[in-house]
């Protein structure tokens, strides 16, 4: 049985989130949370919350044992970009792309 949790429009780019996501793919939920707790990246806190949410969904909705859960799929997709302009010399502008991402976690027993 697979249980999913999704967080949308995080304030971090998908590239930065994927650094944390790639470390915990395929690990047990408890092991992944302890691994993320000691990471210095601010994205680790968001990824940890999504993993905890998926584990809670499995426990409350499907009566699965949280100790047996393993992260079967985890990925970060690109979300919408906020486009801003920064003034430059000679009346020109250069774009600033504020990127965000969607994080999806699927746990299975």
Curated annotation (Swiss-Prot):
Belongs to the universal ribosomal protein uL22 family. This is Large ribosomal subunit protein uL22. It comes from the Bacteria. One of its GO terms (molecular function) is structural constituent of ribosome. The gene is rplV. HAMAP family: Ribosomal_uL22_B. This protein binds specifically to 23S rRNA; its binding is stimulated by other ribosomal proteins, e.g. L4, L17, and L20. It is important during the early stages of 50S assembly. It makes multiple contacts with different domains of the 23S rRNA in the assembled 50S subunit and ribosome. GO terms for cellular component: cytosolic large ribosomal subunit. Pfam families: Ribosomal_L22 (PF00237). PANTHER family: CHLOROPLAST 50S RIBOSOMAL PROTEIN L22-RELATED, LARGE RIBOSOMAL SUBUNIT PROTEIN UL22M. It comes from Dehalococcoides mccartyi (strain ATCC BAA-2100 / JCM 16839 / KCTC 5957 / BAV1). Keywords: Ribonucleoprotein, Ribosomal protein, RNA-binding, rRNA-binding. Part of the 50S ribosomal subunit. Transmembrane segments: none annotated. GO terms for biological process: translation.
């Amino acid at each position: 049985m697979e249980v999913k949790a999704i967080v949308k429009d995080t304030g971090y780019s998908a590239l930065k989130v994927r650094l944390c996501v790639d470390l915990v793919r395929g690990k047990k939920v408890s092991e992944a949370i302890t691994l993320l707790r000691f990471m210095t990246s601010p994205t680790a806190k968001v990824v940890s919350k999504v993993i905890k949410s998926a584990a809670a969904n499995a426990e409350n909705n499907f009566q699965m044992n949280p100790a047996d859960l393993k992260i079967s799929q985890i990925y970060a997709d690109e979300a919408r970009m906020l486009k801003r302009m920064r003034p430059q010399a000679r009346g020109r502008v250069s774009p600033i792309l504020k990127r965000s991402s969607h994080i999806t976690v699927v746990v299975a027993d």
